[in-house]
Amino acid sequence: MKESTVIHFPFSVRRGVWLSKYSTFRIGGPANYFKEVNSAEEAQQVIQFLYSQNYPFIIVGKGSNCLFDDQGFDGFVLYNNIQKKEFLSETTIKVYSGMSFSFLGKTLSSSGYSGLEFAVGIPGSVGGAVFMNAGIGNQDIASAIESVEAINSNGDIISYQAAELEFGYRRSRFQNSKEFILSATFRLSKSASSIQIAKDLLQNKLLSQPYQQPSAGCIFRNPPGNYAGKLIDEAGLKGLSLGGAQISSKHANFIVNNGRATSHEVKELIQIVRDKLKSQGISLEEEVRIIPYRLP
């Protein structure tokens, strides 16, 4: 569908919302259409309609792992703000996808629940964490998940068991579909040490990563048997700046926004890193989602 086509939405929408406000990178121009959903019913209605109209759209949570274009997005941005949770049993919890993943980790660990302590150091939403199979070191969301509910193109809610989620290193089935992750059910255990484990993990993250500056987290996936940040550092690129974007001097797998960075500058830095490492026989793959102004 062409952008110029007039759309009459059966629900309220906003125009010209700046995506920089919905990105931890603080980069991004205005969205053509923008809609915040706060319930499963709202999400079902919006998704079914967008698919029926074949209108281009993206789903955004806390915006912690994406780079929006300076021009914005020539389509529909569906902002997920569904933030409920409920215990299904003493050690099983269902959490809706718009909730902060780090908040969930802090809440559970401080209440004596183990299984998601690593979440305290991961910005973003529960849905985003499922989408990326977020984790730290050898811990990831796949190790604690029991099932996921998602909304398909017909607006129907479907359930996937853990074995159906195609989890891999920073991968899930949802990266190859446009299903809306609605909720995740986690298996936990009771532990008196959970709060200390969470505190230690968070402290390590704060010491090693540039959390005081806007960024999108790790830019590249770690290649097998190595660390992208270490390779970028050894290539002499740590601290390299281009305009307002800089390869962090604290952790070389982060690009930070020094207050005036553009998406073009960030993408240029990413390409510089890729080219430099490629010349050494190393191929790096982006972990950050680069969202173009117009979908292909």
Swiss-Prot record:
Any idea which GO molecular function terms this record carries? FAD binding; UDP-N-acetylmuramate dehydrogenase activity
The record's SUPFAM superfamilies line, in alphabetical order, gives: FAD-binding/transporter-associated domain-like, Uridine diphospho-N-Acetylenolpyruvylglucosamine reductase, MurB, C-terminal domain
Places the protein is found: Cytoplasm
Domain FAD-binding PCMH-type intervals? 26-191
Q: According to the UniProt record, what class of enzyme is this? A: oxidoreductase
Gene Ontology CC entries for this record: cytosol
EC number(s): the record gives: 1.3.1.98
Report whether Transferase shows up as a keyword of the record. Answer: no
An example of a Pfam family matching this protein is FAD_binding_4
Against PROSITE patterns, the record matches this protein to: FAD_PCMH
Q: Which family does it belong to?
A: Belongs to the MurB family.
Under PANTHER family, the record lists: UDP-N-ACETYLENOLPYRUVOYLGLUCOSAMINE REDUCTASE
What's the protein called, per UniProt?
UDP-N-acetylenolpyruvoylglucosamine reductase
Native species:
Chlamydia felis (strain Fe/C-56) (Chlamydophila felis)
